[in-house]
């Protein structure tokens, strides 16, 4: 007995001690790969800062974005009093850009979220059941893909009317087929795997297989595409507002601000410069973040 205890203690002492921070979990592996993406980290920091600005925009602005007017500084450039200058009505551009982040980001995120939910469900159904389900859903997607996204959004807004809520609906509609095709492709591959056959053999329902086994396998692709799609949605929403179909004055949405700045572009270029830079940096940050997430979630894709 003593010999047995001695051998057991010797084996235990010989075994390497694994510290908690050395245990490899999917989350640790993701973070280890993602933090090597320096550009994506910077982009992620910018996106996080933008989200915080959007949440607290009303408290961060030095002036009221809609009801403050400095009639003595019309179209004045950047100064210590007005960091981004003043527009033709005397409104502080810095305050309007900050509040515009709240509106533009909300429009982009909500539109993509709606499109992702509906598109994911349709993609799961089309890929899993195939047959007439697949043909019907994919033909609808083909019809939607036949039109450029912005033209489809213009048509939807023309029917529903102008306003930021209708812009969200319009942008969401042309996001649906993109998510549906993505999820359908993943579903067609995953449903052939042995673990799906095992789930069927033990009597798992189609709903359980779809949402407990197949959907988790598509999450990484959805997250990456969701992130990159936000940039596209922000541009689309800003374009509609620029055309007068989205947010209406005096709402400080970035696209609407560009529309209002057209008349003073020559004498006061700063009025259009800062909203345009905000759109550019935001879209760039979401795209770079999406690239980094893709490389971290599926390193086989890189290269």
Swiss-Prot record:
Q: In this entry, which stretches build a coiled coil?
A: none
Q: Which cysteines does the record link by disulfide bonds?
A: none
Annotated ABC transmembrane type-1 domain ranges read: 101-290
Its membrane topology: Multi-pass membrane protein
| Pfam families cross-referenced by the UniProt entry | BPD_transp_1, OppC_N
Q: Which domain of life is it from?
A: Bacteria
Q: Which PROSITE patterns match?
A: ABC_TM1
TM ranges are 37-57, 105-125, 144-164, 165-185, 208-228, 230-250, 266-286
Q: What does UniProt give as GO cellular component?
A: plasma membrane
Transmembrane among the record's keywords? yes
Which Gene3D superfamilies does the UniProt record give?
A: MetI-like
Q: Name one GO molecular function term.
A: dipeptide transmembrane transporter activity
Annotated localization: Cell inner membrane
Q: Where is the signal peptide?
A: none
Q: Which UniProt keywords apply?
A: Cell inner membrane, Cell membrane, Membrane, Transmembrane, Transmembrane helix, Transport
Q: Which family does it belong to?
A: Belongs to the binding-protein-dependent transport system permease family.
Quaternary arrangement and interactors, per the entry?
The complex is composed of two ATP-binding proteins (GsiA), two transmembrane proteins (GsiC and GsiD) and a solute-binding protein (GsiB).
Matches recorded under PANTHER family: GLUTATHIONE TRANSPORT SYSTEM PERMEASE PROTEIN GSID, OLIGOPEPTIDE TRANSPORT SYSTEM PERMEASE PROTEIN APPC
Role this protein plays: Part of the ABC transporter complex GsiABCD involved in glutathione import. Probably responsible for the translocation of the substrate across the membrane.
**Record's protein name:** Glutathione transport system permease protein GsiD
The organism that produces this protein has a lineage beginning with: Bacteria, Pseudomonadati, Pseudomonadota, Gammaproteobacteria, Enterobacterales
